[in-house]
Structure formats: structure tokens, C-alpha cells
Regions:
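Hydrophobic transmembrane alpha-helices
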Residues: 2-58, 62-67, 72-73
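Short helix-perturbing small/polar motifs within transmembrane alpha-helices
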Residues: 2-33, 85-136
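Membrane-embedded alpha-helical hairpins and interfacial helices in multi-pass inner-membrane proteins
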Residues: 37-46, 84-85, 108-166
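Central hydrophobic cores of alpha-helical transmembrane segments
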Residues: 66-75, 112-120
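Membrane-interface helix-loop junctions in multi-pass transporters/channels
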Residues: 75-81
Length: 166
């Protein structure tokens, strides 16, 4: 099912319409609640980008990037200060989802699967250096950090272990 963009003629043009001004805070709220829920329940998934996906698909990559960035800043100021650093990852996710959606990559199950791999790769490429700098390569997710520990114990490079941890 193809969704129509909100007041957008080009993927990169951004019009701050009433719909977009409503969508961005809604997306930030969805991100915030989903991220807090996932962290609170210690779920082995990152749910803090659901609103970013929504904004990117409905209003384009710029709106998605803005909503992801704002969420990380607000989350960082209220619940988890390190979250602010990962705002750049949310920007990358918003751009990737928006570009893929604008080019029809969410039109079939197969394309959605490929899109998920691309988005995960973008997220991991951006997050890995941040994880190495701030956490020694770990992510804070138990199963990923276990894999990281096994790889490092077997003399794998920290960068590779951290990327795999993602």
C-alpha cells in the first residue's frame, strides 16, 4: 500500500504545513514512549524509531530526521543523557526510511525485508563508532553484548565485534 506524502513535491523539499507540524510532535511522542517502554522492559529491540519511520514515510526524510533528532535530544534531557549522542543515528534512520519509501521500497514484502536490512545497516554504521567511543563497543542489549564479549575474547577487532553487537 502506497501512502501519499503530506504536502511534498520532492523528496527533499520540506514544507512546514499544519499537518507536518502536527506529525512531528506526534512522531516524537511515539518514539519517546516506545523507547522508554523497550528500555523499561529490557526488550532486545530498539523501538525508539517507530515515530521516525512514520514521519519519514508520511512527510519525507527531512521530517523523519527532524522527529528522530528532537526525540533523542528530549529523551537525553529527561531519561538517558547518552541518548542525545545517538541523535545522529536517528537522523540517518529518518533519511534512509524517507528515501526508501519515496522510491517505492515498501511496496512488497520482499522489498520491505530488503529495506529493513538497509536501514539496519545504516543504523549500525552510524552507531558503531559511537558505541566504541562511549561504551567500549557495547550496546547495553544483553544478547548483543554477549556476542560482543565472545568475539572480543576470541581476538576479533573491537570495531567488528561492536558492529555485530548492533
Amino acid at each position: 500500500m502506497k501512502t501519499e506524502p503530506i504536502h511534498r513535491t520532492s523528496m527533499w523539499k520540506f514544507k512546514l504545513s499544519a499537518a507536518t507540524m502536527t506529525l512531528i510532535p506526534a512522531a516524537v511522542g511515539i518514539n519517546y514512549v516506545a523507547k522508554a517502554l523497550a528500555e523499561g522492559l529490557k526488550l532486545p529491540v530498539w523501538l525508539g524509531s517507530l515515530g521516525t519511520f512514520l514521519a519519514s514515510m508520511l512527510a519525507g526524510p527531512v521530517a523523519g530526521a527532524i522527529s528522530g533528532f528532537i526525540n533523542n535530544v528530549i529523551y537525553g534531557l529527561t531519561l538517558s543523557p547518552i541518548s542525545t549522542v545517538y541523535a545522529i543515528t536517528s537522523i540517518g534512520i529518518g533519511i534512509a526510511v524517507g528515501v526508501l519509501h519515496a522510491n517505492g521500497w515498501f511496496s512488497s514484502a520482499r522489498r520491505v525485508f530488503v529495506s529493513a536490512i538497509i536501514i539496519a545497516f545504516v543504523s549500525a554504521v552510524i552507531s558503531t563508532p559511537l558505541n566504541v567511543i562511549f561504551w567500549g563497543g557495547q550496546t547495553g542489549i544483553a544478547w548483543g553484548d554477549s556476542l560482543f564479549a565472545v568475539m572480543v575474547a576470541n581476538h576479533a577487532p573491537v570495531w567488528l565485534a561492536s558492529f555485530t553487537d548492533e
